[in-house]
Amino acid sequence: MPKIKTVRGAAKRFKKTASGGFKRKHANLRHILTKKSTKRKRHLRPKGMVSKGDLGLVIACLPYA
């Protein structure tokens, strides 16, 4: 049976944690930042976790993570 390919875009976006979850970066922090408040940008800065509902999709994209 052939190996399962990793989705390369997902491999660049998600990192697996020791407890089995996945870290991710928040959206809306790339451009057009002048109209966004400092508070909003500050809250988007730390890494988020992939929610339980999306976890299966991420695991399917990263079979060897």
Swiss-Prot record:
Gene3D superfamilies: 4.10.410.60. One of its GO terms (biological process) is translation. GO terms for cellular component: cytosolic large ribosomal subunit. InterPro entries: Ribosomal_bL35, Ribosomal_bL35-like, Ribosomal_bL35_CS, Ribosomal_bL35_sf. It comes from the Bacteria. One of its GO terms (molecular function) is structural constituent of ribosome. Keywords: Ribonucleoprotein, Ribosomal protein. Belongs to the bacterial ribosomal protein bL35 family. NCBIfam families: rpmI_bact (TIGR00001). This is Large ribosomal subunit protein bL35. It comes from Erwinia tasmaniensis (strain DSM 17950 / CFBP 7177 / CIP 109463 / NCPPB 4357 / Et1/99). The lineage of its organism: Bacteria, Pseudomonadati, Pseudomonadota, Gammaproteobacteria, Enterobacterales.
